[in-house]
Design a protein with these regions (language model features):
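Juxtamembrane regions of bacterial inner-membrane/periplasmic proteins
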Residues: 2-276
Length: 276
């Protein structure tokens, strides 16, 4: 009996080493391949500015009704430095979107392999694999066209961004340009639209609610679908527990706390229904 147990333990340890080795080698191959391709096509890539915040400072688009009243302002982005954004939100968005953000260099090979396995082998499509830096590159420099060429350039731009800017600068730029639904681009506008407060004032639950939105801005925002929003926020909070940002008690307290959603202003602007 002891011989069998020893044999099984030996097999398990061997398989563990094999899997870890496979993942490591695959990661090295991916990183090396991307590096080689980068030097081949780097002249075709967009130029990165000296300061990422300048890209976010685009003039907003105003939508008017037939009688000349402003119905909605799209792309109204007031840039917030990281110290003006709730630490709860910073931790929440990292936990749910890119848990290895402070460890990778723009690309997370393990996440890509995991996403490939779940999407291809198991037939699931919920797994993305894109890091925060990749998402930033896509949102700032590329269209949302789905093609291998666009994805490759996105990866290369992510490397370039990581080699040019610090992690806080990248996180700050991401928080200021990501789309939160309801015409809200950036954390400042999202905080005002959904909760009527500044980003620094967001509670833990409100931070989780906002961090949950970018995955599906129109379906998982608290104005369109409060139940789905809270369900997704519960998952975000669990990810924060998994990453050691909060404990189970804090998660439970957050889910019991008051959300204080700002009501959609449909009575004053009934035409805004067509803008959702």
């Amino acid at each position: 009996m002891l011989v069998k147990q020893g044999f099984y333990m030996h097999v398990i340890k061997f398989l563990q080493k094999y899997i870890v080795g496979f993942v490591f080698i695959s990661g090295v191959i991916v990183m090396s391949g991307v590096g080689v391709i980068y030097f081949q096509v780097k002249d075709e890539l967009p130029q990165i500015p000296k300061n990422l915040r300048y890209i976010n400072q685009q003039p907003p688009t105003e939508i008017y009704s037939r009688d000349g009243k402003v119905l909605k302002i799209l792309g109204d982005r007031s840039y917030m430095t990281l110290d003006l954004i709730s630490p709860h939100f910073q931790k929440a968005i990292i936990a749910v979107e890119d848990s290895t953000f402070y460890e990778h260099h723009g690309l997370d090979p393990v996440s890509i392999l995991r996403a490939f396995y779940k999407n291809t082998v198991k037939g699931k499509t919920a797994q993305g694999g894109s890091t925060i830096t990749q998402q930033l590159a896509k949102n700032l420099f590329f269209s949302f066209e789905k093609s291998y060429e666009r994805k490759l350039k996105e990866l290369l731009m992510a490397f370039q961004i990581e080699s040019t800017f610090s992690k806080p600068e990248i996180l700050e730029a991401y928080a200021n340009q990501v789309y939160f639904g309801k015409g809200a681009y950036g954390i400042n506008r999202a905080s005002q639209v959904y909760f009527g407060k500044n980003p620094s004032e967001l509670s833990l639950l409100q931070s989780a609610i906002l961090a949950a939105i970018p995955k599906s801005p129109n379906k998982v925002n608290p104005i369109n679908n409060k139940e789905a929003s809270i369900h997704r926020a519960s998952y975000v909070l669990q990810r924060m527990v998994d990453e050691g940002y909060i404990d189970e008690t804090q998660r439970a307290e957050a889910l019991r706390s008051e959300l204080d959603i700002r009501k959609a202003n449909r009575k004053q602007n009934p035409d805004s229904y067509f803008l959702d």
